Amino acid sequence: TYLFKLLDSEKTAEVLLELDEYDRAKILEILSAKEIAQKIDEMDTDDAADILGELSVERKSKVLSKIEDEEHAKDIADLLQYHEDTAGGLMAKELVKVNENWTVPTCVRKMRSQAQEVTRVHSIYVVDDNNVLKGRLSLKDLLVAPASAKISDVAIPKVDYVNVNEKSDEVARIMQKYDLDAIPVVDDD
């Protein structure tokens, strides 16, 4: 445990994710809410929600309140609302999404900004002004599109998606059937 506390937050976050539940619980027991929050701050939202899901309701609340990045804390809290064996419980909030009304240069600029917060870019999703999924964007289509083009002109309107309440085994079946690395998760709104 002493050695664990000597590691920086990024390394300890990685270690926490690799430990089995029993060993992770032992470590989390001795860390303060602030120390756990520092580790959680280094994780993607889906991983952070998995770790926090193992804590008591009271401890979870304390840790969430200590996370410095308020938006990150809100995203994690959102994910904790979903049962772990549903699409909502599996999803990550880190993604690249673009608005259908943006021009190509605006899109590229905004994607650069979003990409700094994302570990991997599997897909680029297109949404409308109400954040409703409208399609996906191919990087190739974006690169060859004229600068004056709107994203709605180059987007691919057909996109497979699942509902937040879809069971995880059904999500896996759909992803395997269509050979997908990622699939957008949408709510009823």
What are these regions (language model features)?
Residues 1-189:
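Hydrophobic packing positions in regular secondary-structure scaffolds
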